[in-house]
């Protein structure tokens, strides 16, 4: 990774701020900020916005109430195709606003209904069940994935590396791509690590 930025200390952030996908997404036109559902993270977007603007990243917009959206529900499949998880943390109004903000450069929006799972507090996002590692490679937990979405991924030529139940419970499906086929994964999940390495990925844990 050629450049890493650290968010400065700010009283609007907390321990959960390490999950930097959640309060915003950066697009080619600027950042979109999301109001976090967890009260303790409600002002996190403000700290992120202030810092990103200070380093020259413009603001495209923000999802406003009653819209709800979190970055963990937004997965880019390519530059013009985005999948959005519709669940406890992202609602229809939030999706509508995101469509409006990105309509000039996104051609296809795929809304993916999310299961209730273990309940709202479990915070199940779309990125809990799919992590893109390259344009044609993803780590997935198919058990929580709608059939139409899984079929769509396969039709796009994306190879799916399946996480089993045991490693899913250890966050094995949460993989961060640093570059195509270069990723950061949680240690203690040897099977999905081996699957990634079998596809030529460099895996850091």
Enumerate the language-model features and the residues they cover:
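The feature marks the mature, well-folded catalytic cores of soluble enzymes
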Residues: 1-205
């Amino acid at each position: 990774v050629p450049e890493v930025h650290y968010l400065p200390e700010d009283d609007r952030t907390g321990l959960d701020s390490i999950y930097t996908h959640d309060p915003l997404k950066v697009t080619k036109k600027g950042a979109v900020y999301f109001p976090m559902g967890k009260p303790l993270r409600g002002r996190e977007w403000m700290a992120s916005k202030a810092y990103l603007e200070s380093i020259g990243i413009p603001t495209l917009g923000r999802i406003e109430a009653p819209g709800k959206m979190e970055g963990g529900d937004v997965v880019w499949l390519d530059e013009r195709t985005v999948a959005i998880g519709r669940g406890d943390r992202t609602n229809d109004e939030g999706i509508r606003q995101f469509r409006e903000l990105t309509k000039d450069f996104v051609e296809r929006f795929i809304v993916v209904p999310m299961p209730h799972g273990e309940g709202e507090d479990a915070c199940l996002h779309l990125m809990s069940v799919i992590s893109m590692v390259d344009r044609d490679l993803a780590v997935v937990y198919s058990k929580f994935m709608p059939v139409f979405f899984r079929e769509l991924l396969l039709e796009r030529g994306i190879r799916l590396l399946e996480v089993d139940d045991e490693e899913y419970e250890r966050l094995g499906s949460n993989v961060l791509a640093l570059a195509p086929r270069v990723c950061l994964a949680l240690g203690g999940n040897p099977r999905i690590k081996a699957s990634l390495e079998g596809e030529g990925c460099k895996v850091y844990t």
